[in-house]
A protein has these predicted regions:
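Hydrophobic transmembrane alpha-helical segments in integral membrane proteins
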Residues: 1-18, 110-125
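Internal transmembrane alpha-helix with an interfacial aromatic "cap," most often the third helix
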Residues: 19-30, 52-99, 134-138, 195-202
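Hydrophobic alpha-helical transmembrane segments of multi-pass membrane proteins
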Residues: 11-23, 34-58, 69-75, 104-107, ...
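C-terminal transmembrane-bundle signature of multipass membrane proteins
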Residues: 133-205
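Membrane-interfacial loop-to-transmembrane alpha-helix junctions, especially the N-terminal start
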Residues: 29-44, 89-99, 144-157, 205
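Membrane-interface helix caps and helix-loop-helix hairpins in membrane proteins
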Residues: 56-64, 110-121, 170-175
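Generic alpha-helical transmembrane segments
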Residues: 72-77, 120-135, 188
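Short, aromatic-rich membrane-interface segments at the entry and exit
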Residues: 12, 34-36, 63, 92-96, ...
């Protein structure tokens, strides 16, 4: 059993469950769709990690094919994409070559690396979701006005997620802290940081 793998995943579960609960409470108080969607994204991501940890604890090995976790993680990223789509309401988006190039690069890397396991279909869905999220985020940064910090952080989250899968290809010893865990911790904290930025936008709206 990989002790540091468990520590890393337990940390992610605790952070995301707390963030999901907080976002849900604020969503009800503020009647905010953005915060509700963010809460659902956190919950889905945490569910995927919980399945992974339970498999690791009960069976004692890493799940080689774990579609339950993959579907949960994909659902989380679809919720993140929904947040970015909501930001386009009332905004005139122009075709952006930098945004298109960034989106195409992220989508290509995610698909070619088979980020979501051996399934080409699931990997393609994630690649399209990641690419669309990056495209909208970069477009908002270029043309979107007041709230660019959340868009920048969303791009960082996508990059860290794809980077995590790339790094995992070269990680064989999960018993000690190394680059894989640094990227995963950065991803967890970056996702959690979306909450205060989103809450600030909701308060100022």
């Amino acid at each position: 059993m990989e002790s540091f793998e468990l520590i890393d995943n337990f940390f992610q579960i605790v952070v995301l469950i707390c963030a999901a609960a907080a976002a849900g409470i604020f969503a009800l108080r503020r009647r905010s769709r953005d915060l509700l969607i963010l809460s659902l994204a956190y919950a889905c991501f945490a569910m995927g990690t919980i399945y992974y940890v339970l498999y690791l604890v009960i069976i004692g090995i890493w799940p080689q094919v774990f579609y339950v976790a993959e579907i949960s993680l994909l659902a989380a990223w679809l919720f993140y994409l929904s947040m970015q789509i909501l930001r386009t309401e009332g905004m005139k988006l122009r075709v952006s070559l930098p945004a298109g190039a960034a989106a195409a690069f992220i989508a290509a890397v995610a698909f070619l690396d088979h980020d979501f396991g051996p399934s080409y279909f699931v990997s393609a869905l994630f690649a399209l979701t990641a690419g669309a999220t990056v495209y909208l985020s970069v477009s908002h940064i270029q043309h979107g006005g007041l709230y660019r910090k959340r868009d920048i952080l969303m791009v960082i989250c996508v990059v860290l997620q794809v980077l995590l899968y790339l790094v995992s290809n070269y990680t064989h010893d999960y018993t000690r802290f190394q680059l894989y865990y640094a990227v995963d911790l950065a991803l967890t904290l970056s996702m959690a940081a979306l909450l205060p930025l989103t809450l600030r936008e909701v308060k100022q709206a």
